[in-house]
Amino acid sequence: MSQYAVVTDLNRCTGCLACTVACKAANGVPVGNFWIRSMRVGPVTKEEGGQFPDVNMYFLPMQCQHCATPECVTVCPTGASIKTENGTVQIDKEQCIGCGACLSACPYGVRYINEDSNVAEKCTLCSQLVEQGELPACVAQCGARARFFGDLDEGIDSFEGPWRPEAAGTYEEQQAVRVKIRDAVQPFEDDDLHQLPDTGNAPSNYYILRHHYGDRRDREWRS
């Protein structure tokens, strides 16, 4: 069994919302609802003050974490929420009755009930694209090249992002070019890798936030 996930470099993310727009376009997400949203964290005020580049602020893309032990799957009374072989958490809309139990169980608030169809919806990690060998839309269209997709069972170093801007060829050819995460971002260490708070669900997505980035040696992870 695999565990597909997304790694986001928060030192690169600019909060441009390209991931949100790409997700909506690829998945037909209704107006007013989001499968991924970008949250601004900070700026954090210091008693002693501070000046650039010690600004202590970052953007945090939030989506389904495709947890290893998802509580939303456990509480679903009809078995509509399922953990798949590739590690993603999906919703069988034919089985969903819109009871909202999974919404209450999710610690990250990334599910909602579609008012038109009365079924729960959330990020699918673009399963329709991944099955064709493509990257999730939020990864492929990230303007800052801050997002990477892969299988945690193969290690984070195996995660890949979209083509480099200098890649030649047609759009389709460019989309076929991938770059490994460590070849695309500033160096990071194990203690620069963070996850959202674990309430027993074991989230799968990772976020890079460097404590040693430039002169910002006292940067802290805040959620």
For each predicted feature, which ranges?
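Non-ligating segments of multi-cofactor redox enzymes
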Residues: 1-223
